[in-house]
């Protein structure tokens, strides 16, 4: 295929979108007409998973096509090594313009990620990269110790327009402005490309759009909030009376984030705000699609809509992400393209690491053999794909849990291996809300052993977790394990004793927050 005949690619990635909170997934209240129309024009996946339910490692994984443990992307702030190939760089080197607008969460000195051009709104300095080998005082004393419960209680309405130094980013007020500005940039890019095509200068391109909604804080303009509050709210299962059978590591997370015992009015308020954020997000998706159609680009463009991870949204008495429940680690995924089936649903498990080979497949480029993912196109087209695994894999390394976890979804079961703790096991076909942990039942012992054996062909859990803890500064000079949740008295006592006082702070090279631009050469 000649370069001039290659289709274009648009990837729209939201942040923290619960996989079931869309109209095309059968949600009873949510208004997502643009995502619904996109799903009708393409294929949607019901078992799509993030490879890590945290922003930075998920994004570094899907742009490199490698699992987080392959690139040492453990948590927020882990920089991507400049030597790592990204699909954006591979396209650029092949002469295909790759453009990025909005959030990708690059840290360190590799800010462009190989994109030909980008325009991003740089966040506040709290997400600067931290050293690879130095324990980080800021990790325990800084953003990790924020009272996350307060974001729930403060959820609701914000002003439509705010002044924020023209950066469009304000954590206290939410990310509505960020997404409006980023969508403006994406629309301008499409106008440029549409005009070039009309002038006989057609060249293939790929555009990545990183939107912040519906990431916390749960703040949304009044008109979106009023669509749902107070009555159009689906109360989450197991929210008011959290399951007594929660895994002890999940209970650690619940306690660490202070999320227990939310009242029904508090839940209705925050969920209504979240729903409003989804509809606001959908409006921006609609603006991008409308511009594609206006420029006669829609029919010849591959479009991927996805999110970096999900949102617990009150299920199991939890909010945010980090755990292996489907609300957290599951993601929405829609793929539309020329000559692909319309209105199709696929239930086979897939993960976002497949994005890399999918984009290269569209572009007619080869994927390196060390990438664990596979293109979605043969699956969508109904072809044979003998190398595609029949499982989904995800992992988590951070201190909301005291122990790292690794997840497999296979044959209708979800298995989560916790380092130095018992596993969990759910039958997703019979128990889709994941209320009944089967791991302690004798009849599932063989299945647990089979799952663990499979996991160990993918990763060495103990070795990887030790490497992650060392990188994150959670192993002391004498081998002490500082994997502590933020509410632990021991954590506070260590800080009081000055254990971390001599350790390095964030490097200061990054500069002030604001709009950063790289223009195509």
What are these model-derived regions, one by one?
Residues 1-418, 423, 432-453, 484-521:
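Formylglycine-dependent sulfatase
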Residues 429:
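Residues forming the ATP-binding cleft of Hanks-type serine/threonine protein kinase domains
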Residues 441-486:
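A contiguous, mid-protein "functional segment" used to position or interact
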